[in-house]
Amino acid sequence: LGDFFLGTDYDYINEVLDKLNGRIHLVVGNHDTPSKITWYTSWNNIIEIADALRIKYKKREFFLCHYPVLTASLEQDPNRAVINLFGHTHSKEKFYEDRPYMYNVAADAHDNRPISIDTILNDFDEKVKECISFLGEE
């Protein structure tokens, strides 16, 4: 989410983009300069460029943004809460400040590998249970 590429080696970027499957919904980050964004629009597999997006998957709602954003609290029903997916922090932690509704999808937090949305939901469900259990012990 955001900072699609650092640097300006457009030949390398072309090489990587040619290998990607599917359609790309690009959320802009602080290193995605106006010239890069203009260049991204020339790619057929990038179908959308936005500052933020909302998506639904398996009846769960996600807010995609480059930056961590608080979208819910533990008082909400976890099945109805909006989960923020972000990348900006370059942290190795999956959750921002240990909050289950703020999930870091940056490669830094996942051994420099992409992760599936089902893995995110699994991690989220486990974190919510952990937080609720912790709050119940107080």
Which stretches of residues belong to each language-model region?
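Core catalytic region of metal-dependent phosphoesterases/phosphodiesterases
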Residues: L1-Y57
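Conserved beta-sheet core of the metallophosphoesterase superfamily
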Residues: H25, S42-E137
